[in-house]
Amino acid sequence: MYPGTDYAGQVHIANVGIGPESFLGQSPEMYTYDSCEQHLPDRTSSGNKGTFGKALLVAGSNGMAGAAILAARAAYRTGAGMVKVITAEENRQILQQGIPEALYGSCRQLSESMEWADVIAVGPGIGREEQALECLKKVVEKSRKPLVMDADALN
């Protein structure tokens, strides 16, 4: 709670209602840098970017290109071989300069992009625009791939 409590005035500790039942029978897990290694497959020397996993990111509303760039970089750093970013058209040039190795698309290409991907992440900087809501609904309703949603997607 520190250093935030130094700036908060009087602090009250309260039960916010998150108990064991909140996790749907699953215990929360924490991974450290060292413990993650055992969960990752070894990379074969004959592999290439297409064999190391394809991540689809639905990220970055107009003016929020930075969130999409950070998410794409994180996907590469954690092992994705290929990353495709579905983002607002206004962000395309910024993203291509910030992370040129990534692929780009629009919400119109979302269905084919979901088929292409091995895993999908939705939310970094998508905001509350109508197009963001349409993309989010499409992913949640139609995709059967592993899905990560951040706070923007949940809002």
Model-derived features with residue positions:
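Small-residue (G/A/S/T)-rich helix-start motifs and N-terminal tracts that mark the onset
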Residues: Y2-A151, N155
